[in-house]
């Protein structure tokens, strides 16, 4: 219940403009002590909210990874398309957390990227792509990490507070980099969606 209320308030007011007291006021008499028994700070609440979203994201990644009708390259393209198109992304960018001032959140993203998403979802797909001939690399582990670090961190406007123009330029570099690996897996529709999410974030930060 705490996470549901917190997430709703984060959406309505933005993370930076929501206080612990705001959350308590919506919990029907639950005391501040009860909140702090489970969460030491507002940042801890945000981390828990994002972790719940990560579970849903992992389910999507697993479903694509386990499909038998796609090549490795096709699976990577599907993952990027589905990840950026999910409506929950609008919610995340509306909450507009400041990653630079919330180190636990940033560490959690890096930890999930390197220790979970890359080895458990992207790496098996790259290995499949090597086997079926759709992906060429001698360094599958490093490529899996590189793809996600660039997509989840470097291209993330919530981390570097990128403008729409900066997001466009980063996307084009990412696109060229992927093409250099023979991975033509991102297209103009994905670019338009990234610009849209950047705009949502910038408006939420105002």
Identify what each model region corresponds to:
Residues 30, 56, 86-94, 129, ...:
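A short secondary-structure junction motif
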Residues 3-4, 16-17, 38-62, 77-81:
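An amphipathic alpha-helix adjacent to DNA-recognition modules
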Residues 127, 131-132, 163-206:
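C-terminal peripheral helix-coil segments that are non-catalytic and often amphipathic
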Residues 88-134:
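Short secondary-structure transition hinges
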Residues 61, 117-147, 151, 155-162:
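Hydrophobic alpha-helical bundle segments that form small-molecule/ligand-binding pockets
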Residues 2, 6-10:
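Short hydrophobic clusters on alpha-helical segments that form packing/core surfaces
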Residues 9-44, 48:
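Helix-turn-helix
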Residues 48, 62-95, 144-147:
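Hydrophobic alpha-helical connector segments
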């Amino acid at each position: 219940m705490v996470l549901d209320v917190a997430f709703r308030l984060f959406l309505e007011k933005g993370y930076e403009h929501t206080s612990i007291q705001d959350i308590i006021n919506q919990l029907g008499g639950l005391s501040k002590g009860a909140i702090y028994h489970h969460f030491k700070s507002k940042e801890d609440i945000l981390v828990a909210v994002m972790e719940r979203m990560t579970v849903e994201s992992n389910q999507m990644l697993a479903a694509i990874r386990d499909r038998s009708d796609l090549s490795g390259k096709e699976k990577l393209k599907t993952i990027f398309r589905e990840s950026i198109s999910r409506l929950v992304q609008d919610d995340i960018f509306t909450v507009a957390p400041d990653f630079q001032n919330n180190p636990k959140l940033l560490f959690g993203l890096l930890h999930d990227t390197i220790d979970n998403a890359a080895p458990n979802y992207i790496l098996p797909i790259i290995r499949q792509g090597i086997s079926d001939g759709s992906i060429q690399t001698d360094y599958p582990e490093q490529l899996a990490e590189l793809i996600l670090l660039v997509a989840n961190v470097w291209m993330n406007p919530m981390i570097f507070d990128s403008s729409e123009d900066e997001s466009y330029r980063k996307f084009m570099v990412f696109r060229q980099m992927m093409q250099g690996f023979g991975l033509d897996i991102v297209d103009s529709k994905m670019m338009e969606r990234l610009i849209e999410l950047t705009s949502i974030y910038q408006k939420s930060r105002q």
